[in-house]
Amino acid sequence: MQGLTERQQQVLHYIRQSISERGYPPTLREIGAHMGIRSTNGVNDHLRALERKGYLTREDMKSRALRPRDLDGAGAGGGADLRGALVNGGNDAPANDQEDDLVEIAVVGRIAAGLPILAEEHVLDTVRIERTLVRGGREVFGLRVTGDSMIEAGIFSGDYIFVRRQLTAQRGDIVVALIGDEATVKYFFPEKDYVRFQPANAAMAPILVRASDFKPAMLLGVVVGVYRKL
C-alpha cells in the first residue's frame, strides 16, 4: 500500500479512536474540528486519499459510514466488527473497483434565503451511493427532513431526501421550495391564480402562493429519493 502523510495518519488515527471509544465513526465536521480543518472539502480531500491508498472505505447510503479496512485477514468484504478493523494491521488491501459506480452527494441540514444550497456552513456530511439510485448525478443534493408535513407520502421527520436541483417541476411532483426564508417539502400544484404547495398530512393546510408572486427561483428541486436510517 502507499504510504500516508502525517496529516493522513492523524485523520485515520482519529477515525479509529472514535470507533474504538464510541462505537461509530466521526462526522466530517468532527474530523475538521479535531484536525483544525475549517472546510469540509478539506476533510474530504484527506478521506479520498485514505480511500485511494486502501486504508479506508465509506459504505453507501450511510451518514457515519467511514470504515477503516481490516487489513489482517477479514478483508474488505464486510462482516468484520468495526472495532476489530481499526486495530489490525497488514500489508495489502483490495482496491475499490466500484468507485466509478458511486456518486458523492452533499447532505445539508438547512437551506436559507440568499445563500447557495450547498453553502459550506450548511453541509452536514456527504454520502456515496450508486449512481443508478439517483437521477441527476452531481445535480443532486441531500436534505434532512424535519416535521410531519409529508408523512402520508412516506417521508418522515429525520429522513434524508435526495433532491435534483432544477427550477421547473411537473404538477404533482414532490418539490423542495424556498418560501420566505425557509425551505419546505411539499407536493407542487400550479393553479390558475396561485401555486399550491400541498402537504401529505390531512391535519395540515396547503401553502398558497399567488401566481403573480411565484418565481421559478422558489423551486430548489424535485425529490428523487428518500433514505431512512433504521
UniProtKB/Swiss-Prot annotation:
List the HAMAP family.
LexA
Please state the gene responsible for encoding this protein. Answer: lexA
> What Gene Ontology molecular-function terms does this entry list?
DNA binding; serine-type endopeptidase activity
For the site Cleavage, which positions are given? A113, G114
- Looking at the UniProt feature table, which residue ranges are given for the DNA-binding region? 28-48
Annotated active site residues, numbered on this chain, are S149 (for autocatalytic cleavage activity), K186 (for autocatalytic cleavage activity)
Cite the EC number. Answer: 3.4.21.88
Give the reaction(s) catalysed: Hydrolysis of Ala-|-Gly bond in repressor LexA
Q: What is this protein called?
A: LexA repressor
**UniProt keyword DNA damage present:** yes
Q: Which family does it belong to?
A: Belongs to the peptidase S24 family.
Please provide the record's keywords in A-Z order.
Autocatalytic cleavage, DNA damage, DNA repair, DNA replication, DNA-binding, Hydrolase, Repressor, SOS response, Transcription, Transcription regulation
CDD domains with a match to the protein in the record: S24_LexA-like (cd06529)
Which function does this protein serve? Answer: Represses a number of genes involved in the response to DNA damage (SOS response), including recA and lexA. In the presence of single-stranded DNA, RecA interacts with LexA causing an autocatalytic cleavage which disrupts the DNA-binding part of LexA, leading to derepression of the SOS regulon and eventually DNA repair.
GO process annotations (BP): DNA repair; DNA replication; negative regulation of DNA-templated transcription; proteolysis; SOS response
User: What binding partners and quaternary form does the record give?
Assistant: Homodimer.
| Pfam families reported for this sequence | LexA_DNA_bind (PF01726), Peptidase_S24 (PF00717)
